[in-house]
């Protein structure tokens, strides 16, 4: 089986100092010249940090808590993934061009690769981040289900690649730090996955207020109910079961696996954890952003 898997650097390559999927960068001019609109809302995460969760919450806010409207289509059609390109199957730019305003735009890009038009049009941006140890666990399982991705081999080997920034979208450290710098702009809201798990009501209200809407109790209740982990895991519009099996193998692992804080404890042997934490401290010592790896 493994011999038929694509080689790692056949699929991914260095792009302006960031490891990227070559399918995405093949048509980079389309991304770079993308024309943002002033009322676009950009939702940014490093991969496996809760983009589907926060995206569904934001879409519920835009649709004023109308669950049926949110169930009219898969999330990847309602919130197009800007740089995603899989030849004829998925084209985020094309989807966005065809969307009426106001658009919600998803991206995993580090700040330096974001199309300039988002800054020029002064678009609102939500950046959601998650602690690195849980991200790497979730990313490992994601690698196992994406058909075009190479076999990640052992978890410890994947962690080494993650620490080196040799996974798609590059270094987690650089990504977080680049967006933290941008969050000094009042149009950028910097959020934490762990805060959402701790007190979802507080964080939903924060999102609603950032989007300059009224956080009515009834709306907040509907959003919390509809975007609970179990609801989203069972919802075909959010669990990625609408993607063709040629792209994703959900029999290996569900797209929405656990949705908890601290699952890293079930995967990191002690020696690997110590090595990871030493590496983490070295790279984050000058960054004021503090993460919680457990609640």
Swiss-Prot record:
What catalytic activity is recorded?
Answer: estrone + 3'-phosphoadenylyl sulfate = estrone 3-sulfate + adenosine 3',5'-bisphosphate + H(+); (24S)-hydroxycholesterol + 3'-phosphoadenylyl sulfate = (24S)-hydroxycholesterol 3-sulfate + adenosine 3',5'-bisphosphate + H(+); 17beta-estradiol + 3'-phosphoadenylyl sulfate = 17beta-estradiol 3-sulfate + adenosine 3',5'-bisphosphate + H(+); 3beta-hydroxyandrost-5-en-17-one + 3'-phosphoadenylyl sulfate = dehydroepiandrosterone 3-sulfate + adenosine 3',5'-bisphosphate + H(+)
* Positions bearing Phosphoserine: 156
Please name the Gene3D superfamilies in this protein's record: P-loop containing nucleotide triphosphate hydrolases (3.40.50.300)
Tissue specificity comment: Liver of young mature males and uterus.
The answer on whether this UniProt entry bears the keyword Metal-binding reads no
GO MF annotations for this entry? estrone sulfotransferase activity; flavonol 3-sulfotransferase activity; steroid binding; steroid sulfotransferase activity; sulfotransferase activity
Tell me which InterPro entries the record gives: P-loop_NTPase (IPR027417), Sulfotransferase_dom (IPR000863)
Q: Catalytic site residues? A: 108 (proton acceptor)
Task: Summarize the activity regulation.
Answer: Inhibited by estradiol.
**Record-listed 3'-phosphoadenylyl sulfate binding positions:** 48-53, 130, 138, 193, 227-232, 257-259
Q: Which UniProt keywords apply?
A: Cytoplasm, Lipid metabolism, Lipid-binding, Phosphoprotein, Steroid-binding, Transferase
This entry's comment on induction and repression of expression is: Induced by androgens and suppressed by estrogens. The expression is under the influence of pituitary growth hormone and thyroid hormone. Is regulated by progesterone in the uterus.
Q: Name one GO biological process term.
A: ethanol catabolic process
Give EC number(s), comma-separated: 2.8.2.4
Q: What class of enzyme is it?
A: transferase
Record family assignment: Belongs to the sulfotransferase 1 family.
Q: How does it assemble?
A: Homodimer.
Q: What is this protein called?
A: Sulfotransferase 1E1
Q: Which organism is it from?
A: Rattus norvegicus
Report which gene this protein is encoded by. Answer: Sult1e1
């Amino acid at each position: 089986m493994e011999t038929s898997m694509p080689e790692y650097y056949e699929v991914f390559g260095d792009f302006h100092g960031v490891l990227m999927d070559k399918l995405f960068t093949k048509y980079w001019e389309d991304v770079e010249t993308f024309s943002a609109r002033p009322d676009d809302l950009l939702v940014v995460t490093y991969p496996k940090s809760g983009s589907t969760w926060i995206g569904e919450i934001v879409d519920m806010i835009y649709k004023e808590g109308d669950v049926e409207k949110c169930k009219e289509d898969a999330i990847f059609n309602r919130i197009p993934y800007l740089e995603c390109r899989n030849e004829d199957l998925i084209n985020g730019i094309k989807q966005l061009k065809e969307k009426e305003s106001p658009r919600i735009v998803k991206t995993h890009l580090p700040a330096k690769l974001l199309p300039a038009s988002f800054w020029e049009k002064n678009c609102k941006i939500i950046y959601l981040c998650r602690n690195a140890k849980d991200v790497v666990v979730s990313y490992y399982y994601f690698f196992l289900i994406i058909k075009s991705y190479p076999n990640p081999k052992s978890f410890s080997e994947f962690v080494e690649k993650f620490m080196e920034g040799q996974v798609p979208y590059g270094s987690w450290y650089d990504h977080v730090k680049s967006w933290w710098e941008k969050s000094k702009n009042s149009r950028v809201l910097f959020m934490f996955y762990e805060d959402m798990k701790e007190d979802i009501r507080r964080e939903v209200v924060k999102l609603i207020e950032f989007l300059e809407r009224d956080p009515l109790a009834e709306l907040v209740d509907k959003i919390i109910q509809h975007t609970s982990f179990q609801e989203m895991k069972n919802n075909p519009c959010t669990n990625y079961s609408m993607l063709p099996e040629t792209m994703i193998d959900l029999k290996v692992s569900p797209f929405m696996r656990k949705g908890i804080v601290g699952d890293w404890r079930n995967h990191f042997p002690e020696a690997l954890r110590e090595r990871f934490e030493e590496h983490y401290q070295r790279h984050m010592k000058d960054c004021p952003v503090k993460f919680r790896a457990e609640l």
